[in-house]
């Protein structure tokens, strides 16, 4: 938070005074945060994110972190001479790729996040979908967005069957910050790679979260001219799907966000993780950042 330390004392007091109503309003509430994009690869942004999560916990909120790891997985696959393939925003995951995904997400990325949170003064525990039976999954049946008669085989990519949040709630009650890798398990104990945005959205619904915040590499959802769309309803999102404005990796992100909004998550925000402390600005100020998704 070096940029915050340089702020004049009078301005700091003003910021804290503005945050107080939101601290009161969200005290005891669950905030599910999908952590991904440049915020995961830039060391300064990594430290900022960890400090922001710890701050939310210290002021009485219950942050739950679900992380991605696409760039790190891609780097590991490249080292093995294996080329990544995506269909409709989902990584095709054969058995070898699944091993790499598990190792990178649970063994590398997750532990880095947990370590940074500890360094910032918080207490974090890393989980995968196997821990406490958190995420049960099955093979994803993927059909073409435009022609449902076309089906794709994406390997060990998972579709969530159920989420048992008891282990997450137990950690929250013990003042820990859960850090979750998006890996599920199936009936035969097989592992599944699940899109982190989808996991975050489903988990936010099950936990009855106050907010779902998705950190991305863009200012939010952009129209075809590149302008930010600050507020989107289900009907508007359907139109953006139909005309191809929302495509690729944004498809599962927006679909999951909309599902969470429809299921009762009070606020769903897609914000720019490249902006230092963007999450705090979204949660603790009256300034609107990024795109807000509403069911109607």
From Swiss-Prot:
Keyword Cytoplasm annotated: yes
EC number in record: 2.7.2.8
Protein name: Acetylglutamate kinase
HAMAP family: ArgB
GO biological process: arginine biosynthetic process via ornithine; L-arginine biosynthetic process
Organism annotation: Delftia acidovorans (strain DSM 14801 / SPH-1)
Source species taxonomy: Bacteria, Pseudomonadati, Pseudomonadota, Betaproteobacteria, Burkholderiales
Keywords annotated in UniProt: Amino-acid biosynthesis, Arginine biosynthesis, ATP-binding, Cytoplasm, Kinase, Nucleotide-binding, Transferase
Catalytic activity as recorded in UniProt: N-acetyl-L-glutamate + ATP = N-acetyl-L-glutamyl 5-phosphate + ADP
Localization: Cytoplasm
């Amino acid at each position: 938070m070096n940029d915050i330390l340089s702020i004049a004392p009078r301005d700091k007091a003003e910021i804290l005074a503005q945050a107080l109503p939101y601290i009161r309003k969200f005290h005891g509430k669950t905030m599910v945060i999908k952590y991904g994009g440049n915020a995961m690869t830039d060391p300064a942004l990594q430290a900022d994110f960890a400090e922001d999560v710890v701050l939310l916990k210290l002021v009485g909120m219950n942050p739950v972190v679900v992380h991605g790891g696409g760039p790190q997985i891609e780097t590991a696959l490249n080292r093995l001479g294996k080329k990544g393939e995506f269909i409709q925003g989902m990584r095709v995951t054969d058995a070898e790729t699944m091993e790499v995904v598990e190792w990178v997400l649970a063994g590398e990325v997750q532990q880095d996040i947990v370590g940074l949170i500890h360094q910032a003064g918080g207490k974090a525990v890393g989980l995968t979908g196997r821990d406490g039976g958190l995420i049960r999954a099955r093979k994803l049946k993927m059909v073409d967005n435009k022609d449902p008669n076309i089906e794709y085989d994406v390997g060990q990519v998972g579709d969530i069957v159920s989420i048992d949040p008891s282990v997450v709630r137990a950690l929250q009650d013990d003042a820990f910050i859960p850090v979750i890798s998006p890996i599920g398990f199936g009936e035969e104990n097989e592992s599944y790679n699940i899109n982190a945005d989808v996991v975050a959205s489903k988990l936010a619904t099950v936990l009855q979260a106050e907010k779902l915040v998705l950190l991305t590499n863009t200012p939010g959802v952009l129209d075809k001219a590149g302008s930010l769309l600050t507020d989107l309803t289900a009907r508007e999102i359907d139109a953006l799907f139909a005309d191809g404005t929302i495509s690729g990796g944004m498809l599962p992100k927006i679909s999951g966000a909309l599902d969470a909004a429809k299921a009762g998550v009070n606020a769903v925000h897609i914000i720019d993780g490249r902006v230092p402390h963007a999450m705090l600005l979204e949660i603790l100020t009256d300034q609107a950042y990024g795109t807000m998704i509403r069911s109607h």
